[in-house]
């Protein structure tokens, strides 16, 4: 099962993988989270229309659906194997941070009902905001809803960006000239995207596809301007090393997604100041301030200390520094595993190497690259 944020992801990142699955006789399903309907610049150019309304975007989304089905056909995957969830394009980060429980249950039901042996999902290191947000949702689904995974394996892929957090660990998929040619034909089906991005799209055909196998207790290395994260007894410490980004006019905002003490999803938002000062922490869902942290440093380097008690220690934390230049993010999300495990994960038993450790006795560090 391949889960993609947009029509065209299947061709850009997983064409060869899908061809291998077809040759192996595997059953295949492809799930598209959005229709890619909020894609204004190519639509304006192709339709010679500056102002786009809801009807225009709906029409564009249907066109992109048809392109995806044509690309799948080139790769040997029938149209009946594709499903479209029609989530709002360019809004997946907002959905993730403001309440996505219904979407998580939908995704969990889709995966559980079909029970694939291999699940391909976007990487949280992808620099497209929709891709990394969908990746976080699927990690939440993986950890919270799919307790009986059985023999299911999950793999992540990247479409956008060259994050070392992904590429330094990814496995390369072997590909033949025949498979590359089919990938080019699949990419060529996405005519709406080739008008403005032909070179960028065709460049994907010359790159080897890469995957990372996801682990149950995975730490994602530091990425972008975040050089390390550590849980301390009373605070979450985030070390920043920021470069100059002339295309980033706003103050960088830091987001932390986790669970509160009763297990509900909570997303904290804060502006990163340019000099040492207190930091007001807001709940992204209701825009209410609920905590105060401290920044020590300047516009280029420093440490954020955030009260660790605002999040449950038995769940993973996801952290993102938003410094968006034009459209793409500087980096995706980082994942810090749970500090406390109340019991073994499904299929695991406690060992001497995996004891239960109280929160005030553990320091969980994402090391500086």
Stretches with model-predicted labels:
Residues 1-114, 139-152, 238-240, 244-247, ...:
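Active-site rim/loop-helix segments in enzyme catalytic domains that contact anionic ligands
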Residues 10-12, 37-40, 125-131, 163-165, ...:
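Active-site environment of divalent metal-dependent phosphoester hydrolases
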Residues 117-127:
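Acidic beta-strand-to-loop metal/phosphate-binding motif
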Residues 93-96, 131-133, 167-168:
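A short secondary-structure junction signal
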Residues 126-144:
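Short Gly/Thr/Asp-enriched flexible loops that form oxyanion-binding sites at enzyme active sites
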Residues 66-80, 97, 144-369:
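The feature marks non-catalytic terminal segments
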């Amino acid at each position: 099962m391949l889960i993609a944020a947009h029509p065209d992801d299947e061709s850009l990142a997983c064409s060869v993988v899908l061809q291998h699955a077809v040759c192996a006789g595997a059953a295949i399903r492809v799930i598209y989270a959005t229709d890619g309907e909020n894609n204004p610049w190519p639509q304006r150019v192709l339709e010679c229309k500056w102002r786009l309304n809801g009807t225009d975007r709906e029409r564009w989304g249907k066109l992109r659906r048809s392109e995806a089905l044509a690309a799948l056909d080139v790769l040997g995957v029938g149209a009946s194997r594709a499903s479209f969830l029609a989530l709002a394009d360019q809004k997946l980060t907002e959905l993730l941070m403001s309440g996505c429980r219904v979407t998580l249950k939908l995704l969990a039901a889709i995966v559980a009902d079909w029970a694939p042996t291999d699940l391909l999902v976007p990487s949280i290191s992808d620099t497209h905001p929709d891709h990394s947000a969908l990746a976080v949702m699927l990690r939440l689904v993986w950890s919270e809803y799919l307790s009986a995974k059985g023999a299911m394996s999950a793999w992540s892929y990247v479409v956008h960006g060259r994050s070392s957090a992904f590429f330094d660990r990814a496995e390369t998929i072997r590909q033949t000239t025949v498979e590359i040619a089919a990938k080019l034909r699949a990419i060529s089906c996405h005519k709406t995207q080739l008008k403005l991005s032909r070179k960028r799209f065709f460049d994907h055909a010359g790159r080897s596809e890469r995957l990372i196998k996801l682990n149950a207790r995975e730490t994602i290395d530091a990425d972008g301007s975040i050089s390390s994260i550590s849980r301390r007894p009373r605070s979450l410490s985030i070390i920043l090393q920021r470069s100059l980004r002339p295309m980033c006019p706003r103050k960088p905002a830091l987001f932390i997604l986790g669970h509160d003490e009763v297990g509900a999803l909570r997303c904290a938002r804060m502006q990163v100041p340019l000099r040492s000062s207190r930091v007001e922490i807001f709940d992204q869902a209701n825009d209410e301030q609920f905590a105060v942290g401290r920044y020590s440093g300047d516009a280029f380097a420093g440490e954020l200390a955030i009260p660790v008690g605002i999040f449950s220690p038995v769940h993973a934390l996801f952290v993102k520094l938003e410094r968006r230049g034009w459209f793409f993010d500087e980096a995706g999300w980082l994942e810090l595993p749970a500090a406390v495990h109340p019991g073994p994960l499904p299929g695991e038993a406690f060992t001497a190497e995996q004891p239960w450790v109280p929160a005030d006795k553990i320091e969980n560090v994402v090391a500086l690259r």
